[in-house]
Amino acid sequence: MTELSESTTSKFVTINEKGLSNFRIHLNDAGQGEAVIMLHGGGPGAGGWSNYYRNIGPFVAAGYRVILPDAPGFNKSDAVVMDEQRGLVNARAVKGMMDALGIDKAHLVGNSMGGAGALNFALEYPERTGKVILMGPGGLGASLFNPMPMEGIKLLFKLYAEPSLETLKQMLNVFMFDQSLITDELLQGRWANIQRNPEHLKNFILSAQKVPLSAWDVSPRLGEIKAKTLVTWGRDDRFVPLDHGLKLVANMPDAQLHVFPRCGHWAQWEHADAFNRLTLDFLANG
């Protein structure tokens, strides 16, 4: 088997969806079997490969086709200013990508912004949704216990507005529980992505000015999602509050919750081995 790397799995598709006309989506695509689409978060410099390179190998080895798209306006995908809430537009992008790749149905894995996209996809395209795995998803409105936005989201917007290596360090320090995991390689790679795509940063701010984060809230519709769902959370998440996990399992018909201790907002990276075991078991047996 060809070694999995960003370059060996990289490809582009062109989609045509509402708000995304003749739009190029970049993705990494590896393996054969049932499709698992992993949707990344919304921090500056984020992308499919950088969010999930600790997960793609075990999922491919377990017999899945793993697809890591760059969301519209991120990394190598085309630039865009959005006039609708981002979770919905990103869900349309996933649907368009599936059409282009000839995929009828897929399991969805979504972190933060990617979780919001997964929730919107499950609502808009239930017949094309397999199982759903969420990690600290956005798009769930107010918190019972925390003032919103939380500390991490404030730093995220600061980094979008005033990109600097120092602000990136500040955000990553809040991002993860164990700050020793913030290697120079991770820091420099993320910073390089930020510098490579200044248009993406400006467009994210413009989109947020047009459509505020409060518009992402799909809480009133959670009962419509019939897909089997595994909700995971970092106990120490400083971006999205843990009580949102309880909101999900209280309102979705078939959802369960797993909380990782000593874990921030990036469970699939901070606790990659445990996350891979848990989620692969859920896909096979959940």
From Swiss-Prot:
Record flagged with keyword Protease: no
Domain of life from the UniProt record: Bacteria
Catalysed conversion reaction: 2,6-dioxo-6-phenylhexa-3-enoate + H2O = 2-oxopent-4-enoate + benzoate + H(+)
E.C. numbers: 3.7.1.8
Keywords of the record: Aromatic hydrocarbons catabolism, Hydrolase, Plasmid
EC category: hydrolase
Site (Transition state stabilizer): 112
GO biological process annotation, one example: biphenyl catabolic process
TM annotation in the entry: none
Domain (AB hydrolase-1): residue spans on this chain: 36-271
GO cellular component: membrane
Binding site for substrate: 42-43, 51, 111, 180, 190, 266
Active site positions: 265
Subunit structure: Homodimer.
Record NCBIfam families: biphenyl_bphD (TIGR03343)
Role: Catalyzes an unusual C-C bond hydrolysis of 2-hydroxy-6-oxo-6-phenylhexa-2,4-dienoic acid (HOPDA) to produce benzoic acid and 2-hydroxy-2,4-pentadienoic acid (HPD).
Family of this protein: Belongs to the AB hydrolase superfamily. BphD family.
Protein name: 2-hydroxy-6-oxo-6-phenylhexa-2,4-dienoate hydrolase
Organism: Burkholderia cepacia (Pseudomonas cepacia)
